[in-house]
Amino acid sequence: MELEYPEDLRYLETHEYVRLEGEIATLGISAFAVDQLGDIVFLELPELGEALKVGSSFGTIESVKAVEDLYPPVSGTVVDRNQAMIDSPELIADDPHGEGWLLKVRVENPDTALADTLSASEYRTQVAGES
C-alpha cells in the first residue's frame, strides 16, 4: 500500500507535519512515521499554554517497536491537545493526517513559520530513501 502525504501539509525530516491556518498550526506525525512505528501504545504531549520551540522535543510517542521524541515544525504556544489520541493513541494510525492530529499551536511568526519545512513532494523523496 502506498502511503499518502497531503499537499496542504508541510513536513519535517523527523516525520512530523504541520497544517497552518492563519496563526493556528495543527501538528501531527506522518503516515510514514505511523507505518515505521507500528502499533502505537503511548503518547506524551505538553499541556495547554506550554511554549514549543523548533528543534526542541515537545513529547514522545511509544510503540511496541520504539520510543521516539516529537519535534515541532513551528514555534508557538499550545492551544489545544487531541485528548482522544492521548487516551487511545492506537487511533492515530486510522487517520494520521486528519483525525489523528496531536496538537494545535498559536504560531509566533506565521509568515515565516514554515521556512524550514518540506513540501509533500520533497518529503516523499526523503522517505523513499528511508524505506
UniProtKB/Swiss-Prot annotation:
Its cofactor is (R)-lipoate. Pfam families: GCV_H. It comes from Microcystis aeruginosa (strain NIES-843 / IAM M-2473). Keywords: Lipoyl. It comes from the Bacteria. One of its GO terms (biological process) is glycine decarboxylation via glycine cleavage system. This is Glycine cleavage system H protein. GO terms for cellular component: cytosol; glycine cleavage complex. The modification N6-lipoyllysine is found at residue 65. The glycine cleavage system catalyzes the degradation of glycine. The H protein shuttles the methylamine group of glycine from the P protein to the T protein. Gene3D superfamilies: 2.40.50.100. Belongs to the GcvH family. The gene is gcvH. Disulfide bonds: none annotated.
